[in-house]
Amino acid sequence: MNKVYGSAKEALADIVKNGQTFAVGGFGLCGIPEALIAALRDTGATNLTAISNNAGVDGFGLGQLLETRQIKKMISSYVGENKEFERQYLAGELELEFTPQGTLAEKLRAGGCGIPAFFTKTGVGTIVADGKEIREFDGEKYVMERSLVADIALIKAWKVSIS
């Protein structure tokens, strides 16, 4: 498989499908893969689940995919700066799974390692734990978090190894 492509559009051409889950790198609006997000938008794929620490802003980052209504669910730790996200969520048009930032990173790490779930104290006693298994270890309560595995990961890089 050739891992070097001439454009973001070319890189996504044969791998993007409706209903996929994709993870997006960056933090806030820093280091986000703008070209890949635009290329994903241009594929027209729908019913996507986005894993990202934020929902972008109107017209930028994941905001582009929200404006075209391609995202059906967000798994995120922060969504507060996107008016279109807010509109869709409050209208019941968009699913949201809030996940604390550290837990989000661990869910992706665990998924990449083949670990299906893990327990954490983060979120115990909050809405984050609603509907999730709670167990007690050594007198402390922990919430079980299911790992995340994306179909596609979009990252921004300056330099990569082609091997």
Regions found by a protein language model. Give the residues of each.
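Conserved alpha/beta enzyme-core scaffold
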Residues: 1-163
